[in-house]
Amino acid sequence: MKPYDLPDAQGHFGQYGGVFVAETLIHALDELRAAYDHCRLDPKFIETFNYELKHFVGRPSPVYHAARWSRELGGAQIWFKREDLNHTGAHKVNNCIGQALLARHMGKPRVIAETGAGQHGVATATVAARYGMECVVYMGSEDVRRQASNVYRMKLLGATVVPVESGSRTLKDALNEAMRDWVTNIENTFYIIGTVAGPDPYPRMVRDFQTVIGNECLEQMPQDAGRQPDYVVASVGGGSNAMGIFYPYIPHENVRLIGVEAAGEGLDSGRHAASLAAGQVGVLHGNRTYVMQNADGQVQETHSVSAGLDYPGVGPEHAWLKDSGRAQYVGITDDEALAAFHDCCRIEGIMPALESSHAIAQAVKMAPTLPKDTIILVNLSGRGDKDMHTVAERAGIQF
């Protein structure tokens, strides 16, 4: 395979990515790009980033053999990359630390963020507290309802949480509001985007901060499993946890990459969030990618039991990986993800986030069809405490 060097200088992954924003944001993006291109090569910045990941986040996160579950399934060996063990409970904090350090380097005292499941909001509020920054988090009011405990966590950390009432009142609407705030307060504000979407340099910047996940796996799997995996499986909403584990494996051609989208109530139901499976190429939130849209190009409302996958677009690098055939993308329904959540709790004593449960469900589906010496590595991107209410509600339990 020829060396992988995307995006190009204009931020394109083939036809995807780029910069599609209002003129008022061009200067801010140019400034951000210059700062990032300086910092990513600056030994002092890299040293500080790595120090924070070790001492504040608790990295490296381990890889773990789900031996009992693998035995029960009677096929491939399932391994988990335990991002749920990070401080704040998910992969999101890796990227937030990187961007907060960048904000500090640029002299921006105020950070803003959008959040769906609340994990990125919590991670942003956490690093803002750590570095003494003002923090405002935009969150769809539907997600505020679904993720009440994370909303309270953000407030405890000193952040202002702004519920967004427009549209479907979910992640895309929160992103729209955050963009508006950024345009208005560009001089003193840094926008910490939580996923590998948005205008360049965000998709590559977020990817780069998250590749610590896959880089650790490259070292850990030979030590703990004896070799690299045959399959790497990760859930895809915007796609940052998946890019973080996929990117270092792209040159390893014998490792198959499988992204798992939210098929909701089924792809035929129209109630899902599988942009790569069912979307068309369009422009959303500053970049060209696959978007869930109707015949008139209007963004469609999405659905997933998991707030973090409930997004009508996907990172442009995933769009490129799909078209190039380097990664394959599949859908897992709400019911399949919930079943995997319950089984993971019962069999392995690990409570995964509903986002991660989609990836686990795919691994569980694949394992019995594969030989016993096959290795499937799943990015267990976060823990499931935040999803207690959703899971209990689905089971008809009130608390």
Curated annotation (Swiss-Prot):
GO terms for cellular component: cytoplasm. Keywords: Amino-acid biosynthesis, Aromatic amino acid biosynthesis, Lyase, Pyridoxal phosphate, Tryptophan biosynthesis. PROSITE patterns: TRP_SYNTHASE_BETA (PS00168). Pathway: Amino-acid biosynthesis; L-tryptophan biosynthesis; L-tryptophan from chorismate: step 5/5. The keyword Lyase applies. It comes from the Bacteria. Its EC number is 4.2.1.20. One of its GO terms (molecular function) is tryptophan synthase activity. It catalyses: (1S,2R)-1-C-(indol-3-yl)glycerol 3-phosphate + L-serine = D-glyceraldehyde 3-phosphate + L-tryptophan + H2O. Its cofactor is pyridoxal 5'-phosphate. The modification N6-(pyridoxal phosphate)lysine is found at residue 92. Pfam families: PALP. The beta subunit is responsible for the synthesis of L-tryptophan from indole and L-serine. NCBIfam families: trpB (TIGR00263). Belongs to the TrpB family. Tetramer of two alpha and two beta chains. This is Tryptophan synthase beta chain. It comes from Bordetella petrii (strain ATCC BAA-461 / DSM 12804 / CCUG 43448). The lineage of its organism: Bacteria, Pseudomonadati, Pseudomonadota, Betaproteobacteria, Burkholderiales.
